Amino acid sequence: MKLLKADNYQTWFLEEGGKAVLIDPWLSKQLQPDNRIFIQRKRNQASLLSDEDYKKVQAIIITAPFEDHLHAESIKSFPKSVKIFTSKLIKKFLYRQGIVDNIHIINAEGVDIGLMNFKALPTGFPYYPATFALLIEDSKGRRI
């Protein structure tokens, strides 16, 4: 399993068997939305992912409804065939951003994406129930 922190904050890229999953993608050079009152910061590259990495993405997982996890422009940059996995609550936020295609609910029973299994687990105070954590297991039984 290849695990890559794809930016300097929240975006994770996992690949096994030529299929990849992105978790909480923020794939922009801009580090805050335009409407933020804070000083705008930018980075030199949108992410550490190569063009080849992008092509391998089969699914996106959104773990929180906050803008640093749910960056609509990054999600919309992928083809509609890329599946989105999230919670029922976060699905509502996606709909408000105009992201309505191919959204699936992930829970503690888990879902297989490529050769990996992803299970949603509850987070602690103060984030639960708005967010979830992940237990990820590859085809060799390795977990993160």
Predicted regions and their residues:
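Active-site neighborhood of phospho(di)ester-bond hydrolases with catalytic His/Asp-centered motifs
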Residues: I23-D24, V57-L70, F85-S87, I144
